[in-house]
Regions:
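Alpha-helical interface subdomain recognition
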Residues: 1-73, 185-338
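General alpha-helical segment detector with a strong preference for membrane-spanning helices
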Residues: 54, 85-86, 108, 284
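A cross-family signal for key residues in well-ordered alpha-helices
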Residues: 67, 86-87
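FAD-binding core of flavoproteins
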Residues: 74-80, 87-201, 327-338
Length: 338
């Protein structure tokens, strides 16, 4: 019940504040400040921070529906990343900077500079929490050399050696086997689940409304088959994404995240393709809202690793990290009480 309250609060806020018009405006270079301030004032950004540190002290499982709502509304600011970053910083006893925080894995160059490519939603973030070979750095976006990446709000960032040395280096400790990519993959899987559901619902509504040859196109068997395949992908992905957020505290289970991100990334291509096939040419137009979601499906599919990467992680766990049968591994992974 408490989880539903958080999800309902997120849904109501995003319906009013994260409209398609605002998403378009931010993508076109408009300021995200008003939207971010609304999220900050509602307390979502500190939801994973322990209560003794001024947050709500929630666990990942309690925020699945919030992240799913963020995906369904194509939220153009790094809310989920900020939640994770602030929780990690609080756990390390480090100061939490104001504003939105993106997450990235960085590569230290021989000259000491730090490269991050791409940084998801880095164009609308104030800071970036970077994991690299020597630990962690918390760096301001304003100081970085910035280049555009494939998705309009993602960027490639570079900081000089002097900037890296001067930046805070929080002593963040992750449990064995976890890294920043795993944390972000669990978040992105939840957002993919929300976007997939929204695309499916919009497509289903369109199929029921669009008339052709005297009846809704949803009455034609070929369209019904496409919708059935979409629903299979959408609900399987949602179950997997919820599994990726299962457990207590801030840290997910890496194998469960692998299952979640692989299944959601796999569904992204199939659902986007079917949605545009059913909508026809109109679905590709800039004025139609469907593209706000399907562009994100394609971008998020690759964020923090595509299905190929996470299938490899799951396969390695089966071959090298598990002594029992395949069925035993499936049972232990999908038992969310474990």
């Amino acid at each position: 019940m408490e989880d539903d309250l958080f999800a309902d609060a997120a849904r109501q806020l995003l319906q009013g504040e994260c409209t398609p018009a605002r998403v378009r405006a931010i993508e076109a270079g408009g300021s995200p400040r008003a939207l971010w301030q609304s999220l900050e004032q509602a307390g979502f950004a500190d939801a994973l921070v322990p209560e003794h540190a001024g947050g709500a002290g929630l666990a990942l499982a309690q925020l699945f529906d919030v992240w799913s709502q963020a995906g369904a509304h194509a939220l153009p600011v790094p809310l989920g990343e900020t939640m994770l970053a602030r929780a990690l910083l609080a756990g390390a006893g480090a100061e939490r900077p104001p504003g939105a925080i993106a997450l990235a894995q960085g590569l230290l160059q021989p000259d000491g500079s730090l490269h991050c490519a791409p940084v998801r939603l880095g164009a609308v973030a104030d800071s970036v929490l970077v994991q690299h070979a020597q630990g962690w750095s918390l760096l301001p976006v304003a100081q970085a050399q910035c280049e555009p990446a494939a998705f309009c709000l993602d960027v490639n960032l570079r900081w000089s050696a002097d900037q890296v040395c001067a930046a805070p280096a929080p002593a963040i400790a992750l449990p064995g086997g976890l890294d920043l990519r795993t944390l972000q993959a669990g978040l992105v899987a939840a957002q993919l689940a929300g976007a997939l559901m929204e695309v499916f619902q919009r497509t289903l509504q369109y199929a029921n409304d669009r008339q052709q040859f005297g009846r809704p196109i949803g009455k034609f068997q070929a369209i019904q088959h496409q919708l059935a395949v979409m629903s299979e992908h959408v609900f399987a992905a949602r179950m997997a994404a919820r599994l990726g957020c299962a457990g207590q505290g801030v840290f997910p289970d890496r194998l469960r995240v692998a299952v979640a991100k692989a299944r959601c990334s796999q569904a992204a291509l199939a659902v986007a393709e079917a949605a545009h096939a059913i909508h026809g040419a109109m679905g590709f137009t800039e004025e139609y809202d469907l593209q706000l979601l399907t562009r994100r499906l394609h971008a998020w599919r690759q964020t923090a690793g595509s299905e190929s990467y996470w299938h490899g992680v799951a396969g390695a766990a089966l071959v090298h990290g598990h002594a029992g049968s395949t069925l035993d591994l499936i049972r232990s992974t999908t038992d969310i009480t474990a």
